[in-house]
Design a protein with these regions (language model features):
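Surface-exposed loop/turn motifs in large extracellular/passenger domains
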Residues: 2-190
Length: 190
């Protein structure tokens, strides 16, 4: 199971994750919105859901779903990844045939499945597998209003999918008011 079941307005840093078969997500099962001081998650003073800094998934680890994060927040409540790595000989998504309770497939990525937020200076050399929306770093943009920006990051592993797939992000989010996914100064090889 993940190290944390639920987080809100959290910072996790300087952590190494290793496990033969982690039955779930690698770090956090669920993270949630925080409606801030005024009760409105659109206003100022809305904290980030989680910041993950200098965390690493070590070689030999197998994770059933996405690497670090499970269920996502929404809107402007973002996640930040910085200086995180997923080593070679790591398998993300070994439960790719499994369905969620509502019958939908999981979005799968070495860092996160469904994601709103910022990734800076992260890398993965993992094998990432899933049914649909599978990305080397991020499975899919999670919600229409939140940002999804990946900068100065790289993927050198393998992506296996029966549907939408990408070396950095597996799928965007289609909506008239949705900001685009931003990918800058990233490399993919493998």
């Amino acid at each position: 199971k993940p190290l944390f079941n639920y987080v809100r307005n959290a910072t996790v840093k300087n952590l190494k994750i290793q496990g033969t078969n982690i039955d779930g997500y690698g770090l956090v099962n669920c993270y949630t919105v925080d409606y801030g001081d005024d009760g409105d998650y659109w206003g100022t003073g809305v904290p980030e859901t989680i910041s993950i800094e200098n965390c690493h998934i070590l070689s030999g680890t197998n994770i059933k779903y996405s690497g670090f994060l499970g269920g996502y927040a929404s809107g402007l409540n973002v996640v930040r990844f910085s200086n995180c790595t997923v080593a070679q000989n790591v398998t993300i998504g070994y439960g790719m045939a499994d369905m969620m309770p509502d019958g939908l497939t999981h979005s799968t990525g070495a860092l996160a499945g469904d994601f709103n937020g910022y990734v800076t200076n992260c890398s993965s050399a993992a094998t990432v597998m899933g049914q649909d929306k599978v990305g080397g770093l991020i499975g899919a943009k999670g919600q229409s209003m939140g940002p999804c920006e990946i900068v100065d990051s790289q993927f050198t592993g393998t992506v296996v999918s029966n549907g939408c797939a990408g070396g950095v992000v597996g799928s965007g989010y289609s909506s008239g008011n949705s900001p685009c996914v931003t990918i800058e100064k990233c490399t993919v090889s493998g």
